[in-house]
Design a protein with these regions (language model features):
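Alpha-helical tetratricopeptide repeat
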Residues: 1-95
Length: 95
């Protein structure tokens, strides 16, 4: 499943975006949360309205103990998609 917003990206940007998201997800699964957060930031530069990416970066930052930054991302994901329940877990975990 492709992240939201990829259809609006130009072909070159779209492939870069998808590869960056793939790498960020792999880094997170491998426990390299710093790399994952950095790659999610790169992907967000290409698609700044992706609630999924903000949520994923929030989770990575939460795992690194960066609670204030994780909360900022959780808040932004909630602003972009208020009905998305997954982000609420990260939101409340920051407290």
């Amino acid at each position: 499943m492709e992240p939201e917003g990829t259809s609006a990206l130009a072909a070159g940007s779209r492939s870069l975006f998808l590869e960056t998201v793939r790498r960020s997800n792999a880094a997170c699964q491998n426990g390299d949360y710093a790399l994952a957060a950095s790659l999610y930031t790169e992907a967000l530069a290409l698609d700044p309205l992706s609630h999924v990416l903000y949520s994923n970066r929030s989770a990575a930052r939460l795992k690194m103990g960066l609670f204030a930054l994780a909360l900022q991302d959780a808040v932004r994901a909630t602003e972009l998609s208020p009905q998305w329940p997954k982000v609420m877990v990260f939101f409340f975990s920051c407290y």
